[in-house]
């Protein structure tokens, strides 16, 4: 370069002289002198430049030969002129490389032709020519990470808004988001390899951030607050893939498998880890000890001769976490493992997390990486020891364990003697054991996908807020029933709720399904004279069966990648019901909302029960002559084994339905028809909340976009008069109304009967104050036609109604209208009779007098009993309805306290344990009775019979009192007959036939109508030892003197339907006399 400058200026000087001579010829001497001066100045300028260039050349040769020596320390920085020179050299593709390790003194030289440090693959991938270990080099090799973090830290500190910080983070990874961000693997229950990435990626890229080996698994990382998959590739001896001798490391933070398993056979390895005489070594060591143990393993002699390179790749469906990981992991690509362990990654990630104000559990991610490295190196050590120590003695094995090669705790060196048997086994046995365990290694704690039933009210909205707090993936579903006005109002609120917060919403039209599954069966029940419960039918058939079908079809459409349709159903269904589920499944989200209210099963009692069954079967054969004993034993065996159920047996987990914290708004009455398998799919977030708490939360947070009116009446219909709805569907045309009038005129009698025409129903429509129906003929014309064409011909609606007064023994009215009342009902009957006698009141002179008080129109009439008789000859249905004004008489005590049950459905699928225990007590009492009677009968004679009975009565009064309190054929149970009522105590007596029983309530009820559903409960208490004790005496625990203050929970056992009422003999005779007086035959 200097020679070039020399020749350039030399020729230029000659050229200038040549020009001057030319001018000398033409011009005068004055101009010649000026040009000569200018050329001399140029010559001096050339000389100075040449001297300066020689000086710099001398200095550069001096810098190449010099060696800089200084003591090694992390905190000491290299001098400023060397650092500045490094920056200039990096542009020319130079780098610090070779280091000689001599008493911690570093000698630094410069090398040519090495890859630039600014690339991503800059981290020690190029050190193929090294012969010695570069333990001193790690601060310089990892300097790019520190510099990048410092830049980010300085730039983000100036930003104050959180949104701007996140935008900055996204800008740093803008190219990554476009290329690498694609949907996750749906089957989270399994790990996947990088071959699976091609299925979801448009390009041919087989990695997310850094490229990993082909056989490396992407495994799920638990407890990170987001879905995160991570792949860690550790290579030894410059191999591209992992050695085949080293097997996959166990998953970190798994509950079933211990994370510190160093030998593949876990059963034998547990015996080597006895600490503090009883305690086993914990699954997760402290992080400081774990890092020290990794460094100690890397400092072994045979490890210093080898290269250990690490690359980390990760993926998350959360884009913010994905970009955050990219900033940290982009430099960890084929990095030396020793230098990686000396980087303080935990401190770096903690600072970045505080900068960006993120909520992710970053500490747990780094613990996962360190634990994976720890397990990998331990397995590598053991694999190496196995090859050397096949015939090792017990003493040598103890020394291996004590020298901190396998167990890193120096204080605890108590190791058992059972050692060599583990190493003598074949490798095939170890592989089979590990493969079996790998099926259950992945225990996922991901946020579940939930299908939430959003109705537009307060309760469902509060449940949605609680689910979103826990970061569940929620999709909202609304059941749209266009025939009801309440659903039209609710859909407005539902749309506002989902629009404001950008929530998912699916609207399901259920007009046809509700008509076929709920409305038609309900009308058939009423036609047979029974009183159904459409709310329970709606929960079972629409909100569960039909809803599951809809969910599957929607999810197929939603997750349809390319041509492959992958079905991934929702994990749970959530509702706004006030109920609680108790389960021992720790992964069930119901434990989050009920404060982990689960109890462990007892294993000891199961064995005793099996032995007792065999003993009792033998006793049944011996005691055939005693009828009382046969009766009790047959019931016990019948309910233990012979009940037919369609439920699958699941011995691991149980799911029990409990009453919620708000006992007034409790809705377990509507959920009692579900079995335990169906309950396992439900979540009830409002289990511990009351209605006051919900409204208080809404007021404090200023949430008003919900329907403030409470839903009452029929399910999805709202407030509706049942009698008017029955008239709409059962009364066909106007001709039928005329026929009803003619039949009533023929039935008319002068004695104790007043004529009533069906014009009453038509005149009511003209009133202004009349309540409007929610169901109109215009909106449901198709359903009405379908019902009249297909279902009415199957029904027999030819009624002849008798309204009978039990107090005066008279008949109030006979008609052929539809009077299908429930027992205990008073509103519709009294309105009917008041309007009848006010409108049709006839004076003696023939003039009508309206609104005249009389005996009938001034009282409230209540339905006490009803009976339906079918006349096969005339095809008429005689409907006898018995009414009274005084419902609190002693004559009606039995009919208000007793009934017969059938179709008993237990939630567990078998007789509950709280009732089984009562059978055992009664059997013990009966056995004692037998022994006493058998011993006494030996010495009885005709002479001493009377004397013996007197002695027996006087001497055994105490034992008789105990037997009277607990009769052998009755069991205590608690009952709720209607949703709005409280839980009552009752006695139940099971019959010999299957699924039938007799019920007796202590307190008087409003009435038991056939077809009505009753829910069965039993209270219990949880003691300090987490043991459940079922109780029968509530006064003991509700008392103010109680010091324990145990809360009483109610366990919902199941449901049953009322088949008929219990008629007392006195009431039967009273009804019989009325029929004889009025010439009404009971045989009709």
UniProtKB/Swiss-Prot annotation:
Q: What class of enzyme is it?
A: transferase
Q: Which residues cross the membrane?
A: 1-21, 32-52, 309-329
What GO biological process terms does the UniProt entry carry, in alphabetical order? tRNA processing
Entry's Gene Ontology molecular function annotations: ATP binding; tRNA (5-methylaminomethyl-2-thiouridylate)(34)-methyltransferase activity; tRNA binding; tRNA-uridine 2-sulfurtransferase activity
**Looking at the keywords, is Transcription regulation present?**
no
The EC code for this enzyme is 2.8.1.13
Q: Name one GO cellular component term.
A: apicoplast
Where in the cell is the protein located? Plastid, Apicoplast; Membrane
Indicate the principal place this protein occupies in or around the cell. plastid
Q: Which cysteines are joined by disulfide bonds?
A: 538-715
Q: Which UniProt keywords apply?
A: Apicoplast, ATP-binding, Disulfide bond, Membrane, Nucleotide-binding, Plastid, RNA-binding, Transferase, Transmembrane, Transmembrane helix, tRNA processing, tRNA-binding
How does the protein's chain sit in the membrane according to the entry? Answer: Multi-pass membrane protein
Report the gene knockout effect: Parasites require exogenously provided mevalonate for survival. Apicoplast structure is disrupted.
Residues the record marks as active site: 538, 715
Catalytic activity reads: S-sulfanyl-L-cysteinyl-[protein] + uridine(34) in tRNA + AH2 + ATP = 2-thiouridine(34) in tRNA + L-cysteinyl-[protein] + A + AMP + diphosphate + H(+)
Taxonomically, the superkingdom here is Eukaryota
* Role played: Catalyzes the 2-thiolation of uridine at the wobble position (U34) of tRNA, leading to the formation of s(2)U34. Required for apicoplast maintenance.
Family as reported in the entry's similarity comment: Belongs to the MnmA/TRMU family.
Protein's name according to its UniProt entry: Putative tRNA-specific 2-thiouridylase
Organism for this UniProt entry: Plasmodium falciparum (isolate 3D7)
Q: Specify the taxonomic lineage.
A: Eukaryota, Sar, Alveolata, Apicomplexa, Aconoidasida
């Amino acid at each position: 370069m200097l020679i070039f400058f020399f020749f350039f200026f030399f020729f230029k000087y000659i050229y200038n002289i040549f020009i001057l001579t030319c001018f000398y010829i033409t011009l005068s001497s004055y101009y010649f002198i000026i040009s000569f001066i200018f050329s001399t100045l140029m010559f001096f300028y050339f000389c100075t430049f040449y001297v300066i260039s020689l000086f710099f050349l001398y200095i550069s040769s001096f810098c190449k030969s010099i060696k800089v020596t200084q003591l090694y320390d992390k905190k000491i920085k290299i001098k400023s002129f060397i650092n500045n020179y490094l920056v200039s050299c990096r542009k020319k593709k130079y780098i610090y490389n070779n280091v000689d390790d001599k008493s911690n003194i570093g000698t630094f030289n410069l090398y040519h032709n090495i890859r630039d440090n600014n690339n991503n693959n800059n981290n020690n991938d190029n050190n193929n020519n090294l012969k010695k270990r570069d333990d001193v080099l790690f601060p310089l090799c990892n300097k790019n990470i520190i510099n990048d973090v410092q830049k980010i830290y300085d730039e983000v500190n100036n930003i104050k808004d959180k949104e701007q910080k996140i935008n900055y983070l996204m800008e740093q990874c803008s190219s990554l988001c476009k290329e690498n961000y694609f949907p996750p693997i749906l089957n989270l229950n399994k790990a996947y390899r990088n071959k699976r990435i091609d299925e979801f990626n448009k390009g041919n890229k087989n990695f997310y951030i850094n490229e990993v080996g082909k056989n490396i698994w992407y495994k799920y990382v638990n407890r990170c607050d987001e879905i995160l998959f991570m792949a860690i590739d550790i290579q030894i001896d410059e191999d591209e893939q992992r050695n085949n001798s080293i097997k996959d490391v166990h998953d970190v933070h798994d509950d079933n498998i211990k994370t510190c398993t160093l030998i593949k056979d876990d059963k034998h390895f547990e015996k080597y880890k006895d600490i503090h005489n009883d305690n086993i070594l914990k699954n997760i060591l402290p992080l400081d000890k774990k890092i020290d143990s990794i460094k100690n393993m890397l400092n072994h002699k045979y490890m210093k001769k080898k290269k250990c390179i690490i690359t980390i790749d990760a993926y998350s469906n959360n884009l913010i976490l994905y970009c955050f990981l990219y900033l940290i992991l982009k430099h960890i690509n084929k990095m030396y493992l020793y230098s990686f362990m000396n980087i303080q990654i935990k401190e770096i990630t903690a600072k970045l997390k505080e900068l960006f104000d993120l909520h992710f559990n970053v500490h747990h991610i780094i613990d996962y990486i360190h634990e994976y490295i720890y397990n990998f190196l331990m397995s590598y050590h053991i694999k190496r020891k196995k090859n050397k120590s096949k015939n090792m003695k017990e003493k040598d094995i103890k020394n291996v364990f004590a020298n901190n090669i396998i167990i890193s705790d120096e204080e605890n060196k108590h190791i058992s003697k059972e050692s060599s048997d583990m190493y003598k086994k074949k490798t095939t046995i170890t592989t089979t054991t590990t493969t079996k365990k790998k099926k259950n290694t992945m225990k996922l704690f991901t946020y579940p996908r939930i299908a939430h039933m959003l109705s537009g009210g307060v309760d469902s909205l509060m449940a949605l807020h609680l689910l979103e707090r826990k970061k569940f993936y929620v999709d909202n579903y609304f059941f749209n029933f266009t025939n009801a006005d309440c659903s039209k109002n609710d859909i407005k609120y539902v749309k506002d709720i989902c629009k404001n917060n950008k929530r998912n919403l699916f609207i399901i039209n259920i007009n046809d399904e509700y008509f076929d599954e709920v409305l038609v069966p309900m009308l058939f029940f009423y036609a047979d004279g029974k009183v159904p419960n459409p709310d329970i039918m709606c929960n079972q058939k629409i909100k569960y069966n039909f809803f599951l079908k809809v969910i599957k079809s929607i999810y197929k459409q939603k997750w349809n990648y390319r041509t492959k349709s992958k079905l991934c159903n929702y994990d749970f269904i959530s509702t706004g019901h006030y109920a609680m589920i108790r389960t021992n499944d720790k992964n069930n989200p119901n434990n989050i909302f009920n404060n982990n209210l689960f109890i462990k099963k007892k294993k000891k009692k199961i064995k005793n029960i099996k032995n007792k069954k065999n003993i009792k079967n033998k006793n049944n054969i011996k005691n055939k002559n005693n009828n009382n004993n046969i009766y009790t034993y047959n019931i016990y065996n019948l309910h233990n084994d012979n009940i037919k159920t369609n439920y699958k047996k699941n011995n691991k987990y149980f799911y029990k339905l409990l009453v919620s914290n708000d006992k007034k708004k409790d809705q377990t009455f509507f959920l009692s028809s579900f079995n335990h398998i169906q309950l396992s799919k439900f979540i009830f977030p409002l289990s511990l909340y009351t209605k006051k708490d919900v409204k208080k939360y809404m007021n404090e947070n200023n949430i008003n976009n919900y329907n403030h009116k409470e839903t009452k009446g029929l399910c999805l219909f709202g407030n509706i008069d049942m009698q008017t709805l029955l008239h709409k569907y059962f009364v066909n045309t106007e001709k039928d109304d005329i026929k009803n009038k003619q039949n009533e005129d023929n039935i008319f009698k002068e004695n104790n009967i007043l004529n009533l025409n069906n014009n009453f129903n038509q005149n009511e429509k003209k009133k202004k104050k009349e309540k409007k129906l929610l169901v109109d003929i215009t909106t449901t014309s198709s359903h009405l036609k379908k019902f009249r064409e297909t279902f009415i011909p199957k029904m027999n609606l030819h009624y002849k109604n008798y309204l009978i007064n039990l107090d005066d023994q008279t008949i109030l009215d006979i008609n052929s209208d539809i009077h299908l009342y429930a027992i205990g009902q008073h509103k519709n009957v009294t309105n009917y009779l008041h309007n009848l006698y006010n409108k049709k009141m006839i004076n003696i002179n023939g003039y009508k007098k309206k609104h005249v008080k009389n005996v009938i129109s001034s009282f409230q009439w209540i339905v006490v009993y009803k009976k339906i008789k079918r006349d096969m000859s005339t095809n008429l249905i005689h409907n006898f309805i018995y009414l009274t004004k005084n419902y609190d008489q002693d004559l009606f005590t039995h009919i208000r306290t007793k009934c017969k049950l059938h179709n008993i459905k237990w939630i567990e699928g078998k007789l509950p344990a709280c009732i089984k225990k009562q059978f055992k007590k009664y059997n013990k009492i009966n056995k004692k009775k037998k022994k006493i009677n058998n011993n006494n009968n030996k010495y009885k004679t005709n002479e001493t019979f009377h004397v013996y009975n007197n002695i027996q009565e006087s001497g055994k009064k105490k034992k008789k009192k105990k037997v009277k309190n607990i009769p052998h054929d009755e069991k205590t149970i608690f009952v709720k007959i209607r949703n709005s009522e409280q839980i009552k105590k009752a006695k139940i007596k099971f019959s010999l036939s299957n699924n039938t029983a007799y019920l007796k309530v202590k307190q008087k009820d409003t009435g038991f109508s056939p077809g009505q559903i009753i829910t069965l409960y039993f209270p219990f208490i949880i003691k300090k030892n987490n043991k459940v004790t079922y109780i029968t005496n509530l006064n003991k625990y509700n008392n103010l003197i109680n010091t324990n203050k145990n809360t009483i929970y109610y366990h919902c056992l199941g449901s049953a339907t009322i088949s008929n009422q219990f008629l007392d003999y006195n009431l039967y005779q009273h009804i019989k006399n009325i029929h004889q007086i009025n010439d009404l035959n009971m045989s009709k």
